[in-house]
Structure formats: C-alpha cells, structure tokens
Amino acid sequence: MTTTSTTSVDGRTSSTLKATLSASGPNSNGPTPAVLPQKPKLTGWAQAAAKALPRQQQQQQQARKDDSVAVQPANTKTKTIASTAPPANIKGSSTANGSSTNKKFKRANKQPYNREEVRSYMHKLFQSYTAGEKSHSMKTYKQVLSETASGRVSTATDWGTVSSSKNKNKKYGCLSDIAKVLRNQ
C-alpha cells in the first residue's frame, strides 16, 4: 500500500511518498520485504584483489562477515560494517620468517658510469685522428669549405642533403649519414 502525504517544514510544503508494506502471507501477491544483505558489486582493483585471494581465505572472510552481521541488531537504518582487520595472507605481507613474499628483485649490479675512462678514450681517439698519419680521405674543414665553394663536392660529402626520405626537405645531416660517410672514407 502506498500513501502520499504533504508536510510543512518551516513554511515550505513538500510532498513525500511513503511506501508501507504489509506483512504478506503465503496467499498474498504483493511484494515481500527482503532483509537479506546484498553483496556490493566489486569493480576495478577490488575485483582483482578478490580474485587473487585463495578460496579458503575467501570462505574465512565470508564466515567473519556473517558473524559480524549476526551480532548486529536487525534495525534496517543501521549500516552493516565489515571488520577492517587485514587478511592474514595477502601479497606483500611478511611471512613467518620476516621476509616479504613480494620482493622486487634487484637488477644486476652495473658498473657506474666512469667519466674519466670515457674522457680518456675520446681524447685518445681524437689524438689518433689529428696527430696520426693523415690518410688521403681525411679532409680539414677548410678543404671542405673550399670544395663546397668551388662546386667540386661529391654527394658523399654534401652535408646539406639527407638521404632519408623522411627528412628529405630538411637541410641537416643525420648522424647515421655522417657515420656512413666517415666509415666509407
């Protein structure tokens, strides 16, 4: 049975809808009040965490929840509060010997970056190019400029063009192209 009433609070009128359910017998066709607590649908991380729990632990938690619901009064206005005690066996918790079950494994120890070693290698490499025997393929910057000005530049040493179709219009030399030229000379 549904009734509508109008109430006045502080001079304001508001209509409220009250639904009252009579106790239904076995022969009544009306709705029966359901007192069974419904589980909220788990989504996102809560659903993944629930799936990750072992079956036995889920049953233990369900039994704990049932016990806590049975102790509380059957008043419909009070909310059911589940126990907030942490479960005994969750990933990342400590085991009996004190070690964590979800340890992050350390990466293999790398040697630290040795700036002095790299600096000395680059210096030796530079010295070998400048002080060593100059091959006929090595050119100084002045030689390249003079060849460019005279128009005698081959395509291999034309730094204004790029062989890649992606960077065709751009007027800079790709490092890979420069490396190819240096290797071929």
From Swiss-Prot:
Polar residues composition bias: residue spans: 73-83, 91-102, 147-166
Query: Could you tell me the gene encoding this protein?
Result: PBP4
- Keywords associated with the record: Cytoplasm, Nucleus
Claim: Nucleus is one of the keywords in the record: yes
S-S pairs: none
Q: What else is known?
A: Present with 1560 molecules/cell in log phase SD medium.
Start and end residues of each stretch annotated as Disordered = 1-116, 147-168
Q: What is the lineage of its organism?
A: Eukaryota, Fungi, Dikarya, Ascomycota, Saccharomycotina
Q: Where is the composition biased (Low complexity)?
A: 1-24, 46-62
Q: Quaternary structure? A: Interacts with IGO1, LSM12 and PBP1.
Protein's name according to its UniProt entry: Protein PBP4
